[in-house]
UniProtKB/Swiss-Prot annotation:
GO MF annotation terms: ATP binding; CTP synthase activity; glutaminase activity; identical protein binding; metal ion binding
Classification via PANTHER family: CTP SYNTHASE (PTHR11550), CTP SYNTHASE-RELATED (PTHR11550:SF0)
Family to which this protein belongs: Belongs to the CTP synthase family.
Catalyses which reaction(s): UTP + L-glutamine + ATP + H2O = CTP + L-glutamate + ADP + phosphate + 2 H(+); L-glutamine + H2O = L-glutamate + NH4(+); UTP + NH4(+) + ATP = CTP + ADP + phosphate + 2 H(+)
Glutamine amidotransferase type-1 domain span: 296-546
Function: Catalyzes the ATP-dependent amination of UTP to CTP with either L-glutamine or ammonia as the source of nitrogen. Regulates intracellular CTP levels through interactions with the four ribonucleotide triphosphates.
Other comments on record: CTPSs have evolved a hybrid strategy for distinguishing between UTP and CTP. The overlapping regions of the product feedback inhibitory and substrate sites recognize a common feature in both compounds, the triphosphate moiety. To differentiate isosteric substrate and product pyrimidine rings, an additional pocket far from the expected kinase/ligase catalytic site, specifically recognizes the cytosine and ribose portions of the product inhibitor.
The encoding gene: pyrG
Annotated protein name in UniProt: CTP synthase
Amino acid sequence: MASAASSKHLFVTGGVASSLGKGLTASSLGRLLKSRGLRVTMQKLDPYLNVDPGTMNPFQHGEVFVTDDGAETDLDIGHYERFLDTELSASANVTTGQIYSSVIAKERQGAYLGDTVQVIPHITNEIKARILAMDSEDVDVVITEIGGTVGDIESQPFLEAARQIRHEIGRDNCFFLHISLLPYLAPAGELKTKPTQHSVAALRSIGIQPDAIVCRADRPIPTSLKQKISLMCDVEEGGVVACPDAPSIYDIPKVLHREGLDAFVVRRLGLAFRDVDWTEWNDVLDRVHNPEHEVTIALVGKYVDLPDAYLSVTEALRAGGFAHRTRVNIRWVASDNCTTPEGAQRELDGVHGVLIPGGFGVRGIEGKVGAIRHARENGIPLLGICLGLQCMVIEYARDVAGLRGANSLEFDDKAEHPVVSTMADQTDVVAGERDMGGTMRLGLYPARLRENTLVRELYGGAEEVSERHRHRYEVSNAYRPVLEEAGLVISGVSPDGSLVEYVELPQDKHPFFLGTQAHPELRSRPTRPHPLFVGFIEAALKYSAGTGIADG
């Protein structure tokens, strides 16, 4: 029986194969609805048993995206924030691990009054509660992406919960969007619809009839195939959307709009119909497709074989380029290859900037230090993020301050000079006496910026700024005097002065040598590039033009 719903719900499912771009499609649709004046929020349901991705290998899962409130979430939450230009919270990412943990805890507390606890209704009710918690008088549409592929065992409780929500809030308040692959068979010379038909049949077998289907392919999709899918899957022709690969992820909203998906959704859900305001997004697309300059940035990391491990970093670099109408080419450099001066010279030859991203563990650290040394000695613009800042401190301590045994306790617990140490409230975690998951210094924290520094200039003269963090280690306060005496500028600290947040070199010594303990990439937007990345790309442009070489 239908009930009054303050928000409309749109569920996004995937079929045939994973990695079809459900998150990007959902984000693009969200952007279109927002550009029509609607208030949109988004959520991702992940079917894995981990409570969150915080302890997962980046090679398996990609980056961990941290929200303002300190949640470690799926990388798709980053897409949602960037496309909607909004800040989401922990409620935006729900996992099977969270659901089962909550249900089991309630059972132990006696909350089920002696019931036999089962997947239906207890697990599905918990899932529904998490989805409906996104409802608000301030939200017109909740877009919920259901991770995995239709047919996966792990996804079944989430799909059942979504089916029940449609039943409870009424079909006029709920929309199902299915994203499916049309594979191209070279011997036949055509795209095939049968896998999509089977995928929709699997959805219908569990009680879900999609309202629209987004067809993914590596080439244009003929109208005749769209008509066939409409007939065989019982979906209106206007609800069958062709979405071939686009030149840029930022083109996807235009593709979906040309196919009429946003208008179809608005009509089906009875939402207020307004024209799309393209002003902001057209400016982004103009900067994407009509750059006036070009720079190459070396991203020196441990997980470069899977670019998704650094997704927000690469998007922030590109957005920094948009601010200067500059195409940013990323050179992926495995940090192990920069261990020697010769290796660093070879790998970084011809780049206009070097970025050292975050990470964990000792592998590849000496290569990061080698890349930092090369950039510092050759005046190449350098930006260090989280672990990147810590490696910059290690390199400077060794090669400039004369502390040859300088290291981090994360990599060497017997380091002669532990210039990077374990945070006081993290020692029990490192010792294995407390849970590892969800216990780092996570979320939005403020920092005070020192006057007459590069970082303060980049932030527009602000005395205090807030950025998201994810770390257990910090620059050791015991070594701050010797580092500063050697010329390193500690340009930002926590409000109580106890934690180093930013380090840099004076610009008369190096054009751009800046490290941050935070993760500024997590707050960058294509429509609002982050000031640190804007400044970094500006320095790279100057270096490219031969005007950024330091005198001293």
